[in-house]
Amino acid sequence: MGLLELNGLSPELLTELSYASQLGRSLKNNLDSFEKEALLQDALAAAEWLDINPLLAEVAIDYRIKSAESIRSKYERCYPHRPVIKTFNDILGFRFCCDDYREALSLALPQFKIVDLSHGKAVDDGYRGVHLYYQPDNFHYPIELQFNTLYDRQLNNWLHDYLYKKNYPASVGQALRTRYEQGDFCTIQTFEEVLNDVLSRCER
């Protein structure tokens, strides 16, 4: 049994959970090629459809459906030139824990786009993981499958809670990742101490 099936998922179920846009156009188009409210209402309809979808009860893994506020906020952050499928690529997102990222990378199917962040982003902000995006075609909103080791999940959560949307430079997260790997913190209390130290150094 594969990693997906162990958690109650399968390509077939993901297809059933994929929401087809009602706009009649490929979601590869950029945000500014759609009328703003029509696109937002389409994305919000996807979230509402997922909210009441009984198929999610079959899934034995953490998931979250993006809120209306988050959908609108992401539109504003990404407008005008980002494709819709890269903006609203996580209206439905599943979170997996894995022992090794090779487990996630082995899930190579035509419908999956793999984004390997296990060694960091192009501009490293400390985050580590592997993201898979499931999409039957370009007229459906993608579903995000986020894989992290337990070790990385802990730091990712702290980075999200303390740095996300606060406009700190990526170097802050990168410095925290280095300190984490050096063993300088392993609890929320020691994380906060190291964060304060890193921020004070940035201000000098």
Regions picked out by a protein language model, each given a short descriptive name:
Residues V59-Y63, P83-V84, F94-R95:
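Short coil/turn segments at secondary-structure boundaries
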Residues L9, R77-Y79, V115:
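Hydrophobic alpha-helical segments with strong N-terminal bias
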Residues I85, D90-L92, C97-E193:
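Long beta-strand-rich cores associated with HINT superfamily self-processing modules
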Residues D32-Y79:
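Surface-exposed, low-hydrophobicity interaction/linker segments
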Residues P11-S18, A45-L56, C97-S106, T190:
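Short low-complexity stretches enriched in small and charged residues
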Residues M1-A43, E144-R204:
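An acidic, glycine-/histidine-flanked metal-binding catalytic module
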